[in-house]
């Protein structure tokens, strides 16, 4: 049986864009990531040897010349970074996998090491764990996936007024299998036509000629809680470092690392002008969009010149409701994940790998959705909430 991950490009674009910034600005940063399965009753421990075998396959991969040439052709990738990737591989020594001694059936997966050398682990590891689970606990039925995908496409295309609704695939980490992901994308592109704008997956973007999409993830801004000059200024430091790296390119800022209130407090006129838009990834998307529009208008910036990217738990119905609500008031883009890549019948797993430490200091995300925060230091979490004025129910 071939390995699940066949290419180091089989990951999200933002891993490479963040990795490039790390190489140029924080090559010595040390980090720790931790795996968590939020779905109760999932016995991953019985498949730990299979998962471990797949990790061995992942760590044996190198970038091919063809893959490096592809990356070199992306306007925001710098030659020295692509040259570095030519020497790169994921090293198993930074990863620890074991069955939990605390909770029967759970696994413990920790990643510790240089940020530069561990940042590419997360997405393929999640894809591996998903696929190992589903191929052992369910029967693959692509006909169900095809029928459900067709219904979603017809739902959008059957209504007028959605001609400029931009939809992208963001589903690599939660996919049912690589096989389904590979089949899904051409079907989606054919069905949606001009509504389909690309994928976050670099491998499939290369294979099919789609636009690879993505900018930054939570881990990037979280790390600045340890890298920045002081905690209160960590978000500003992260955004300024991004601006230094990309000089106006890749200008979508993530708004929910320490909550929307703190983000808007930091996102001043300078950032409003500099960045192309913002991404929503937790909390009520309608309230979020209204507040973003009000914030832009308060700085005398026309929201119609900025893009609001929605990427939190979307399905086609939610995409259509959001599009109708905000159309004409701003530019819109939608990143759809699990609803596309893991809707074949079995219940998708809620699994994540989150950064929990940087340079020995705890870091955390204070999401706009209760229960999504993840930190191994309750005292730090309390302090972080206090510094950014975030209530304890987040």
Curated annotation (Swiss-Prot):
Any single Pfam family the record assigns to this protein: NAPRTase_N
HAMAP family, A to Z: NAPRTase
MF terms (GO), sorted A to Z: nicotinate phosphoribosyltransferase activity
Keywords: Ligase, Phosphoprotein, Pyridine nucleotide biosynthesis
Record-listed E.C. numbers: 6.3.4.21
A single cellular component GO annotation: cytosol
GO BP terms in the entry: NAD biosynthetic process via the salvage pathway
Origin superkingdom: Bacteria
PTM statement from Swiss-Prot or TrEMBL: Transiently phosphorylated on a His residue during the reaction cycle. Phosphorylation strongly increases the affinity for substrates and increases the rate of nicotinate D-ribonucleotide production. Dephosphorylation regenerates the low-affinity form of the enzyme, leading to product release.
Pathway it works in: Cofactor biosynthesis; NAD(+) biosynthesis; nicotinate D-ribonucleotide from nicotinate: step 1/1
Lineage per the UniProt record: Bacteria, Pseudomonadati, Pseudomonadota, Gammaproteobacteria, Lysobacterales
Family listed: Belongs to the NAPRTase family.
Record's protein name: Nicotinate phosphoribosyltransferase
Gene for this chain: pncB
């Amino acid at each position: 049986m071939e390995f699940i991950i066949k290419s180091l490009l089989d990951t999200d674009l933002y891993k490479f864009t963040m990795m490039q910034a790390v190489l140029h600005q924080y090559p010595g940063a040390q980090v720790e990531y931790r795996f968590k399965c939020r779905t109760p009753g999932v016995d991953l421990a019985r498949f730990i040897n299979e998962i471990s075998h797949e990790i061995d396959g992942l760590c044996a991969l190198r970038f091919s010349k063809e893959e490096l040439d592809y990356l070199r052709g992306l306007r925001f990738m710098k030659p020295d970074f692509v040259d570095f990737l030519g020497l790169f591989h994921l090293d198993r020594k930074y990863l620890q996998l074991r069955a939990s001694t605390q909770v029967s059936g759970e696994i413990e997966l920790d990643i510790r090491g240089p940020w530069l050398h561990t940042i590419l682990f997360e997405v393929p590891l999640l894809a591996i764990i998903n696929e190992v689970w589903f191929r052992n606990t369910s029967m693959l039925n692509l006909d169900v996936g095809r029928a459900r995908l067709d219904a979603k496409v017809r739902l959008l295309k059957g209504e007028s007024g959605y001609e400029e609704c931009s939809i992208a695939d963001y589903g690599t980490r939660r996919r049912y299998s690589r096989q389904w992901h590979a089949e899904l994308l051409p079907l989606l592109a054919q069905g949606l036509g001009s509504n389909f704008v690309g994928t976050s997956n670099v491998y499939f973007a290369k294979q099919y000629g789609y636009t690879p999409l993505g900018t930054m993830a939570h881990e990037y801004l979280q790390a600045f809680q340890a890298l920045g000059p002081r905690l209160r200024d960590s978000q500003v430091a992260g955004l300024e470092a991004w601006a230094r790296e990309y000089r106006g390119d890749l200008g979508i800022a993530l708004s929910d690392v320490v909550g929307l209130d703190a983000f808007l407090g930091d996102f001043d006129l300078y950032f409003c002008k500099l960045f192309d838009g913002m991404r929503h990834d937790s909390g009520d998307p309608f309230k979020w969009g209204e507040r973003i529009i009000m914030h832009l208008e308060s700085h005398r910036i026309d929201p119609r010149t900025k893009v609001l990217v929605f990427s939190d738990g979307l399905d086609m119905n939610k995409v259509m409701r959001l599009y109708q609500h905000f159309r004409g008031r701003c530019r819109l883009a939608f990143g759809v994940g699990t609803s596309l890549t893991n809707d074949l019948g079995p219940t998708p797993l809620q699994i994540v790998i989150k950064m929990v430490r940087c340079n020995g200091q705890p870091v955390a995300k204070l999401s706009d959705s209760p229960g999504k925060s993840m930190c191994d230091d309750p005292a730090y979490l309390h302090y972080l909430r206090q510094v950014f004025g975030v209530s304890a129910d987040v």
